[in-house]
Every structure is written in structure tokens, then in C-alpha cells.
Amino acid sequence: EAGDFTGNLFTLLNPFGLLRGGAPASLFIFHGANFLALKSLGGIRERARSTSTVAGIVTVVAGGTLLVWNQIERGPAWTWITVVVAAGGLVVSLLADRAHRDGWAFIASGVAIAALVVSLFGSLYPDVMPSTTDAAYSLTVDNASSTNYTLRVMSWVAVIMTPVVLVYQGWSYWVFRKRISAESIPPVHVPTRG
């Protein structure tokens, strides 16, 4: 009420809230394991694939449950498209992982992440943080946005800095483009006190 939180701990720790935290966490573990499998060899790669398989199965179950529950609970009709794209990305990624196609597994899990984000935020729109007591207290895109001056400054910062970040990320990826293995890691030298 009046901008104050009126619930308790169990208002926040409900099954849907826990699923909204756990499903994306498992999806990012899955995505990270796919990337690690893509960039490694030998034992590191096998452990990453093993983690990817387990996290992928957990993600398909938890993520599928979250997407359908969220869609039924509050999603508009157009977000069913993103639900299908996210589910398809998860399934394709899991199948590509099983076929040892690390690049496709990584790309498909990235598509699933993008579709999940669009689905979850699309189901909230125009709210950014909906109120559970009265819709009048919800934070919307309009009342949570910055002033026009701030948005203008941030737009110019983004116009200048986004290409810099993209070039740096491209260069970083190019420098670390080869797969690594445990054998390519140099031994650690501990300095002795003299």
C-alpha cells in the first residue's frame, strides 16, 4: 500500500516465484555448459557435456513448466509464439548436445534465452513490477522510465559505446577462438621466498 511492501517472506517464496528464479538459473547453467563444451577438449569437454545434459533435462522440465504456467496466468496471445520458440530452442539444443554438435547446442540455447526473456517481459507489459495489492501501485514502463534528458544522454552514450563493446567482444572471441584442454594450461609456479 502507498508504495510499501505488505507481504511476508512466504508471499515472495511461492512455487511460481521459485520457478521464475530456478528455471532461468538452470537455463544459464545449460547455456554455459554448452559454451564450455564448445571451447574445450578432452576431460573438460566431457564434464561440460555431462553438466549440459543434466542441466538441459532440468531446464526442459522447469522451463517448460514456467513458460506454460506464466502464459496461462498472465500472458497475452502473441507471447505464445515466444513460448513455442523458447521450447523449440531448448529441445533443439538438447538434441544437438546429444549429437555432440556443440555450436548448434550453444546457438539454440541462446535462442531459448532470448525467447524466454521476450515471453516473460511481454507477459508483464506495460507493467515492469506489478503490484499484488492494487494495480494503481504497479510500476509501469511509463512511470518507471527516466526523464527525456536522461534518455537522450543515455542514447548518445549507447551510440558511442555499443560499437566499442561489440568490437572488443569480437576481438576477445577471436583471440580465444581455439579450444583448450587441461594439457594446454601451463603449470602454476609458486614463487619461493629467498
Segments predicted by a language model, with ranges:
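Transmembrane alpha-helical segments in integral membrane proteins
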Residues: 26-39, 161-178
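Membrane-helix interface motif
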Residues: 1-2, 122-134
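Short, highly charged, low-complexity non-transmembrane loops/tails of multi-pass membrane proteins
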Residues: 112, 178-194
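Hydrophobic alpha-helical transmembrane segments
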Residues: 11-27, 147-165
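Membrane-interface capping segments at transmembrane-helix boundaries
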Residues: 96-103, 167-183
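Long, contiguous internal "core" modules enriched in hydrophobic/ aromatic residues
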Residues: 1-105, 119
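Hydrophobic alpha-helical membrane-insertion segments
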Residues: 107-123
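Short, membrane-exposed interhelical loops at transmembrane-helix boundaries
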Residues: 131-153
